[in-house]
Amino acid sequence: MNETTTKQPLKKRSLSSYLSNVSTRREELEKISKQETSEEEDTAGKHEQRETLSEEVSDKFPENVASFRSQTTSVHQATQNNLNAKESEDLAHKNDASSHEGEVNGDSRPDDVPETNEKISQAIRAKISSSSSSPNVRNVDIQNHQPFSRDQLRAMLKEPKRKTVDDFIEEEGLGAVEEEDLSDEVLEKNTTEPENVEKDIEYSDSDKDTDDVGSDDPTAPNSPIKLGRRKLVRGDQLDATTSSMFNNESDSELSDIDDSKNIALSSSLFRGGSSPVKETNNNLSNMNSSPAQNPKRGSVSRSNDSNKSSHIAVSKRPKQKKGIYRDSGGRTRLQIACDKGKYDVVKKMIEEGGYDINDQDNAGNTALHEAALQGHIEIVELLIENGADVNIKSIEMFGDTPLIDASANGHLDVVKYLLKNGADPTIRNAKGLTAFESVDDESEFDDEEDQKILREIKKRLSIAAKKWTNRAGIHNDKSKNGNNAHTIDQPPFDNTTKAKNEKAADSPSMASNIDEKAPEEEFYWTDVTSRAGKEKLFKASKEGHLPYVGTYVENGGKIDLRSFFESVKCGHEDITSIFLAFGFPVNQTSRDNKTSALMVAVGRGHLGTVKLLLEAGADPTKRDKKGRTALYYAKNSIMGITNSEEIQLIENAINNYLKKHSEDNNDDDDDDDNNNETYKHEKKREKTQSPILASRRSATPRIEDEEDDTRMLNLADDDFNNDRDVKESTTSDSRKRLDDNENVGTQYSLDWKKRKTNALQDEEKLKSISPLSMEPHSPKKAKSVEISKIHEETAAEREARLKEEEEYRKKRLEKKRKKEQELLQKLAEDEKKRIEEQEKQKVLEMERLEKATLEKARKMEREKEMEEISYRRAVRDLYPLGLKIINFNDKLDYKRFLPLYYFVDEKNDKFVLDLQVMILLKDIDLLSKDNQPTSEKIPVDPSHLTPLWNMLKFIFLYGGSYDDKKNNMENKRYVVNFDGVDLDTKIGYELLEYKKFVSLPMAWIKWDNVVIENHAKRKEIEGNMIQISINEFARWRNDKLNKAQQPTRKQRSLKIPRELPVKFQHRMSISSVLQQTSKEPFW
């Protein structure tokens, strides 16, 4: 078929159905392949014998090769024809046998072998036999053909490789056919034109119109193509990837197994395992390092045609609404539909409502994040039109915005639209990267179109960043530390900020955040010399892992330019300081572009790093391969971050550099004037000396300094024509002097190897010349030779020079070692301070916990007291009215509750009611179990409660009598007075208080066991005791029960003779009542 033919979209089938069909087909075809194994082994053995025979014949009998080829070719053809015939006969035999068994046995076929086994076998064998016989075996005319080589002969004798069943399935596309469709026609169609099957398959309408979108649904067929490098997943989707179930051998286009593998990369994960914006490290945390991680950002006002206000969302995980479907990652169906590119479904969901368009999943990603990540521009436009926040950030662990996701994945149209609708290109994620820095390097892509897209994205982000910062007024608002609050996405990192960050790092929230970060690299001794160690150093320099870098260089590890530039680029001042302290040259440039560290540091908002480099002696006048200086990159930042203070700092550094070297040049000029004769003599001597001495002179530091001065002054003309006025006289004099010597230095530097060879030859010639041959020479030549001999270095001079060089090296090593010791001492002091601060924090934490524990104990005690009070109040509500109003603090009003009632048992022991004694003595402990033995207590019989109520009503209903002179036995006055209350109300109160009285716990106790310390009080109480009879209570109760058992009035009325008069018919009832009342006491 034509390769340009486009494939039609395929029908989407369920994953479980597809897998079951594939596994069934695999089992069937494996059984078929086993039947052919023996035949293949026999054939392979024959082929090996043929190859061996052919090699031996070719080696021993080269003259009979032609005849041997014809014989072997005919034998091979005959063997092949016999094999094909045998296979055809076997196949026909098996078909006849199977059809015969089907007629005889009916449905006796096993369940695990489908009916299409024979058809599949027939088709496969036909395909194999046709493929094995036709293409690779040719009928060759041996007589008319040219002689064969040994390789051609071996290729002719070797039988073509037979295809296995798995290869056949993979090539012919049988894995995509349903089991019920596996007929002869379909199988034959698949073996000839496998592409035709795909044309008849389309996506079902249910996938397009339904709102029930799942995480396993396929992505829309019109999704944008990702840039062809590699596919990574976002941090929250790391665990979502799944592997193929069949080792990637049988996955067809209907399978959704690898759907999760096509998730686009996220800048957070692609840029490293940890943020260059560091929290407090475990070891070396107090050094000044990268900008803080969690800046406080305010909304920046801007003017836009859409009149939409800028907003940067807080990276807190929102409260998720209940009742809305979410997958394992916390995504709603709206987010899933945006991820899959289903525009119609998204539009329908938004129109129907019920979904928060800015709802975030477990990783803090919104629907706009999903659409921007996958590059669905139509969905992005729809979401923004309906109020999606373009600057919302994911959780603090990632901190990505939709613009960062779109930029990292190369979606140019999405980037354009987001920038047009107010997306902030200066926002940094948790890795400290902006959208510009998240874009991949062009060198990682081979396609020119992809490179063009990346360049366009960077261009637009750079322009947008400049416009954004200019609108924010960055040139007018400077911070104390030099970092502009509007330009840089972090606050100034001074000592105060550092202390706050350290304090925040010790808090539980920051501690939990640190735990979520990837662990730092561990140092091994092999890292010093291995390539893996250099990669670890590069990663640590990029991510700001100070402990690893310190340990690496302390153990003698070599610092490379790549790691140094990365630490400068990311703004890690502490790591840059360590590199410089251990002797890394601050002015070393890259090999390709001649870029210096200062050029890398400027224009990125790392003002502290720029200051550090300048203090370490960075040359601000260096130029790269394009002739640009650090000042140019500071003014024309590729990230759009221009800081006026940084520009001023570099200009001052250049001015100071020029001024310093101009003074040095003036001093050199004075020395030249004072030693003019010596200088002239040196000039004359240069014309006659040997090339070696000339090369030595050209390599002196003086010439190098003069070349640097020349280059520096040229830079001054380019960068400061309009800004600074340099002294004309000093500049012109030094420039003239340098131009005179520049050509000499250049000439010797270009021809160094040639001059060295010529010089050696000249010395050998001088040595080979005899004294006789020297005599005819002119006095001028002898004088030149004499001068050259005079200036040759003697042994003493050489020893002195070597000694000076050795002393200089020692001093330099000592100075370097001293610097390293000072740095390590500083690191140790910082570590000690950090440990002290941690101990202090621990003490404060212990005090806080102790205070919190005490406060909690007090709170629990108060709650317990309130609970006890509430309990007592609840119990008090169960007391009768008279008991409530008794004052238990007054122990002298016992007379109000007399007389005291008691009864006598068989042993003549007096028993009193404990409740009345408690009221008399105001002793609550009297009712406790420990005070009175349980064996000596007699519980109150329920039948006695009514008589006791009648006796003690004056206490529990009326609250006792008044203790005054007017109160007497005949006319008692009580606390509670029901004189003004009608009879029904009074009866109701009495009934209510009686119910409370009978619920009180009461018991009879021995009067002798009651302890009263005041004998007068005891004597007075005993004088007011009244004896009652318990037996009478029992008899009265029994009579009452008997009365209840007596026939009712109606029953008795039926027994009364009707002949009696009416006034005598009820005589018996009246007499029983009279008898009962006569037995009861009248009190």
Curated annotation (Swiss-Prot):
Q: Which residues carry this modification: Phosphothreonine?
A: 37, 700
The biased composition feature labelled Low complexity covers: 300-310
Amino acid composition bias (Basic residues), ranges on this chain: 314-323
Coiled coil feature spans: none
List the cysteine pairs that form cystine: none
Pfam families assigned: Ank_2 (PF12796)
Protein keywords: ANK repeat, Phosphoprotein, Repeat
The molecule here is called Protein HOS4
